[in-house]
Amino acid sequence: GIDTGILRNFSDSALAKLIGYMKDKNFTAVRKWLGESDIEPTEFFRAFFDKAEDHIAKGSMPQLVLHLAKYQYQNAFAADPEINLMACLTEIMADCEFL
């Protein structure tokens, strides 16, 4: 299984794995990764924002920020935060260029 201690800290290796799936537009793998992780959505949004510069093209950063802000806000009202977070990752996969 997945080491939840590593995911709570949203390690670089966990992020790299997720980013790899997103770069490949592998929706199924992203969904599986998210389902197996127990990362807190608020923690995720912050960590993804902090580490995104290393993985997202500069020209895509404004779009990334807009997606993260929108879904971070919606998270407060989401009946199922995992679905909300998956929607966020799906939009980022569709709209952002990965390095």
Where would I find each of the regions flagged by the language model?
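Conserved C-terminal helix/linker of AAA+ ATPases
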Residues: G1-I19, P62-L66
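Helix-rich C-terminal "collar"/helical-bundle subdomain used as an assembly and partner-interaction module
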Residues: L18-L99
